[in-house]
Amino acid sequence: MSYERTLFTPALNVKLGYMAMGNDLGGLDSGILCNFMNAGFCGHPLNMSGGSGWANYPNAHLGARVKYDFSPAWQLRVAAFNVDPSSNGNSSRAWHLGPKHTTGTVVPIELVYKHAGTLPGEYKLGYYYDSSDVKRIGSNKTVSGRGGHYLLIDQAVWSSSTSAGRVLHAFGQYSAASEAASPFSKWYGAGVVLYKPFEGRPRDTVALGYGRAVPNPRSRDVQELAAFNAGTDYPNLNNAEQLIELSYGYQATPWLTLRPDVQYIIEPGAFSGTEIDNALVVGLQVKAVF
């Protein structure tokens, strides 16, 4: 539930209400990342919500967002949302919209650059700060405030001269969060998406992506100490959980998209500190638009 309008000038847009902040910030506006099924790609880098009060759809919070266009290519976005960890995923509090359980305020700021042409692109540089007091990892003490920064890129790198609409886009994601209180220290993502892979399939896509989630070294120290105190061996794990994903978006009808998908997860126990076999995941996404 939100209200949005331009204010004073067409360049200034304001949005107020109870809303998911990830709908306006932290992701690529082009929607390229939702050619994948894994939430590590589709949405925003996972360490934003994993290590701060950032919330993505369907979780909503009270807040305000301001966008200002410096030019057709450059835009600044600033927002402020209340942080309420008890409301995330708690259906019993779905209609408790007040700020009673607020622990702080998360303030993101984004600089956005977009250019059109034969090879269009979108670039986002962002920073966020959560004022909540939270427990410091590996300590009984608390830390006042936690933040992070990110860089998101979507750039067309090839366009067919013989088939209109056949374009290859490359994307990149980098996000770093505070090591004092975030279980994720860094997230890296990269990949390509080919639009119109076949002449008779103008709205189909082929997407290939790689993601790497790096656990906080402090969390690993805590796990190693717990294993030592218990007299057990700590597994010889890499320092990250990794993801490789391949998907095909099939536009069956103007309103129905089918997305068969294959994912390979490398070291899925990197965050829990347990030795788990690599996992092969096969899925199918069905998306209907009315």
Where are these regions (language model features)?
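Short loop/turn motifs that connect adjacent beta-strands in outer-membrane beta-barrel proteins
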Residues: 8-11, 73, 115-123, 158-168, ...
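Outer-membrane beta-barrel "beta-signal"
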Residues: 276-290
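Surface-exposed beta-loop-beta
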Residues: 83-152, 160
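Outer membrane beta-barrel
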Residues: 1-85, 182-186, 196-222
